[in-house]
Amino acid sequence: MFRRLVTPRLLRLRRQQGLSRPYASKAPGSEDLPSAWKMVGVAVVSTLIFVQAAKSIDRSKPQTEFSEAEFEKVRSGLRRRVTVFKPDELEVLAVLADVPVEKIRAPAGARAVRVQQALERFRTDEHDKYHALLEELHAVHGDDYSAHLPKGALVALMGRYLKEVCQAGDSVVLLGFPRNMQEAIQFESEVAVISALVAPQGSEESQLVQYFKTVNKVITV
């Protein structure tokens, strides 16, 4: 179908360009970081998909189809979204999963939050809008269901949980979160700015650690 849109003149021009100017391609180096804006875009779309998935699985109000107007309304709302906590309202220490607990130097009075702790808060609440989705994942995957959440889901739920248990001026230690750079970027664009990332020795080359190194926020233990 697409070949019909290519005119003979355009084909001749392409052949001439191919002969007169050979192209060279260079594979991106392993140290190259993905565009932050692209990651934010993926995070927004992922959040949208998660919200709609949770709605569609709600047994009391099933909905599997959405009009174009409904989709645009949700997407516009995501574009206008501001972070749950303003900059400097919440001190967030993010600790990677491989860091020994005894090596963590948390601020005085800081609240420790684990991923499973936040998810269980909503899974065990039968009146929560995400209860049905989380319950189904738990039934299939057991306690490891957090690894099978839709993209964007974990950050959305972590944000809701922190909004419930924290207030302006608090300090919080996120244990085992974020798990990757996409979650880190989504968290900072939707929930709060991460004050520092605590990483274990030997993780200096990971993209997540490199991302926070660019703003001097890495603590290696």
Curated annotation (Swiss-Prot):
Targeting presequence: 1-23
GO cellular component assignments: mitochondrial membrane
Bilayer topology annotation: Single-pass membrane protein
Keywords assigned: Membrane, Mitochondrion, Transit peptide, Transmembrane, Transmembrane helix
Keyword Membrane in record: yes
Sequence intervals crossing the membrane: 36-54
Cell compartment(s), UniProt: Mitochondrion membrane
Recorded family membership: Belongs to the AIM36 family.
Protein's name according to its UniProt entry: Altered inheritance of mitochondria protein 36, mitochondrial
Name of the gene this protein is made from: AIM36
